[in-house]
Amino acid sequence: SPAAEPAVQTVADSVSVTRGSGDAASDAGQADEEAGLNVKEIVLGHIGDAYEWHMGSIGGHELSFSLPVIVRSPSSGWHCFSSKHLHGGAEHEGLRIATEGEHAGKIVERQADGSDLRPLDLSITKVVAGLLINSLIVVLIVLGVARCYRGRKADSPAPRGFVGLFESLVESLVDDIIAPCVGAGYRRFAPYLLTVFFFIFVNNLMGLIPFFPGGANVTGNIAVTLVLAVATFLAVNLFGTRHYWKDIFWSDVPTWLKVPIPIVPFIELVGIFTKPFALMIRLFANMMAGHAVILILTCVIFVTAEAGAAVNSSMTAVSVLLTIFMNCLELLVAYLQAYVFTMLSAVFIGLAQEHGEPADGETVSGKDETR
């Protein structure tokens, strides 16, 4: 129908692969040679967000995946179109991507007085697309492993291969982190903590893959780590026991530290927010720094190109070796950051729980003796 044509066209535009012209690529390359390699722009361009997914270049043509733009302007209403209409600083439906100012790299709308207005932006950016893809991978892995366990009997041999590895990883997380840190009621929080671990781990690994569908710096985006930290914040405080809140507002300290000036309650109240803040910054900073270091080491090859063949050759060898080392280190960091975030979340949740008598079939540490 005619009414459906704009929507169909938008979807078609969104999934199309755009290709830059040869002349434009040549001009851009010439400009880069004259201005020198902009390492800062390369690094920030990778670790930042974008309205397209750049895949590389073939034969002088830039290949990128245009993502859908979905914004709502207070003056002109909703807009939905492909980001390819905004390439090269172009303006579409009164919208453009700002190149400077406080909204640099974001979609803005030009007002009648010449100022830029930032509309409500619900666009599917590179980070959002990577987040959706990686989340789908986590779901498929969990469903695939769960399917292997359906119909298994108690006397069946232990699973092997990927399923066996997955089971060992889950058991180690539950027995070594979740149960000891949370306590007797660990089963209540185990699904959330396991989900957080595998979500962060898969996103970290996918971020190290240099080509589509990897390469999106999801956990290096502070908005993503903020949501994860808020989720832990809610799990801690919404399910905290009355003893947890009593220790915050009326802890077992001398009375003069609580009244007339509530020194200790104020410190404890601030601690409620500093814990998730530490979770957010730790994950964000570590993942962003790892990506930045790898990119900078790679750029050393091109930065030293003008210093002569001897210098460039030696620095290229050093850069390649250090880059390989950093990539291997990032594989370890990808696991460690997921592990640390899960462990600290379990510790914070455990501190908010009442550790009384263990439940039937459980030890004081929280482990189920019947397993």
Ranges and model annotations:
Residues 1-160:
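Perimembrane topogenic segments of multi-pass inner/organellar membrane proteins
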Residues 194-198, 202-209, 219, 223-227, ...:
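Hydrophobic alpha-helical transmembrane segments and adjacent short intramembrane/lumenal linkers
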Residues 211-215:
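Membrane-interface helix termini and inter-helical loops of multi-pass transporters
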Residues 137, 141, 170-174, 194, ...:
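Membrane-embedded alpha-helical core segments of multi-pass
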